[in-house]
Amino acid sequence: MRIHDFDPDNRPRERLLRSGAASLSPAELLAIILRTGTKNLNIVDTCNELIARYSLEKLANITLEELKKVKGIGDAKAMQIVAIFELNKRLHYSRNLNKKIQAARDVFEYMAGRVPDETKEHLFVLHLNTKNQIIKTELVSVGTLNAALIHPREVFKSAIKESSHAIILVHNHPSGDVEPSNADKQVTDLLKQASTVIQIDLLDHIIIGKTGCFSFRESGLL
């Protein structure tokens, strides 16, 4: 069934005008952006298939090639989907600009959407000023965290250049289990020793998962 064959009261655009965006399903909202379907498949059905296959959460980080595996999604529609989720990420980033960090949860919320590939471990350094506001976010390494591979010089080089008052280490666990490994503890100890020498405070090391985080400082390990 084509969108034009829907009861006028049930068409996504008309319902949005009448009842607001909150009254629409994710598939209907996406359908308004993509506008047209194919000869045999209306755009609402296409969007329902997209969300059923990948989930709304995964759509935010999916590639153009993966999107085009769904019937009815070509280059133009795939680019529209990528663009709308990228705008949402940038809105989130702009709201967190110069965010003041008061607890590990602040870091967890700040990092939402910033890990480019959650199937791999990423180590970030957050640079803070004297008010504990983030002045820079730096990706230091990608891959399994290992004290033998992480050199303090690489971590603190940018902190010195930025005149950072303090730093916070952040890395993700692809498994979702945020409990620290022995390697995580070794890296933390190594960089804590270096921070004492360089006199740039290591405020915390935070491990993030999909739904929560682990703070070395709040757990008494730093």
Swiss-Prot record:
> What keywords appear on the UniProt entry?
Hydrolase, Metal-binding, Metalloprotease, Protease, Zinc
Q: What superkingdom heads the lineage? A: Bacteria
Q: Its Gene Ontology biological processes?
A: proteolysis
Q: Does the keyword Ribosomal protein apply?
A: no
Positions occupied by motif JAMM motif: 171-184
State where Zn(2+) binds: H171, H173, D184
Molecular function as annotated in GO: metal ion binding; metallopeptidase activity
Q: Which CDD domains match?
A: MPN_DUF2466
Give the matching Pfam families: RadC, UPF0758_N
Q: Where is the MPN domain?
A: 100-222
What's the family? Belongs to the UPF0758 family.
PANTHER family from the xrefs?
A: DNA REPAIR PROTEIN RADC, UPF0758 PROTEIN YEES-RELATED
Name of the featured protein: UPF0758 protein Ppha_0935
Organism of derivation: Pelodictyon phaeoclathratiforme (strain DSM 5477 / BU-1)
